Regions:
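Histidine-centered metal-chelating micro-motifs
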Residues: 27-29, 47, 66-75
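A short, N-terminal "cap"/entry segment at the start of jelly-roll beta-barrel domains
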Residues: 1-14, 18, 97-107
Length: 107
């Protein structure tokens, strides 16, 4: 994983749930996917930039939820040490087959 980001996931036939741990300053580069994404921040705080140029900024804090529609480009930065739970429908095939290069490049 990129930087200090770690994840654990379980996938069923129709959906996937993942626990993501980020340290303050960790970033997830802009990307998009055909999956609907529901992000629940358990602890910490994330800044997400949504849109082709990151024109919409949303900060999601502990106890808050964000739904990201399919195919919407987005990136994220941990403003604090953060634990979040992401649900994807359908499951993220790129995560399952380890072709999610945007999360594996650099450090």
């Amino acid at each position: 994983m990129k930087g200090t980001i770690t994840r654990r996931m379980i996938s069923g036939g129709q959906a996937m749930i993942a626990q993501i741990v980020l340290k303050k300053g960790d970033t997830v580069p802009r990307h998009s996917h055909h999956n609907e994404q529901i992000t629940y921040v358990v602890s910490g705080k994330l800044r997400l930039l949504l849109g082709e140029q990151g024109e919409r900024e949303i900060v999601v804090a502990a106890g808050e939820v964000l739904v990201i529609p399919p195919n919407l480009p987005h990136s994220a930065e941990a403003l604090e040490d953060t634990l979040d739970v992401d649900v994807f429908a359908p499951p993220r095939e790129d995560w399952l087959n380890r072709t999610d290069d945007y999360l594996r490049k650099g450090g």
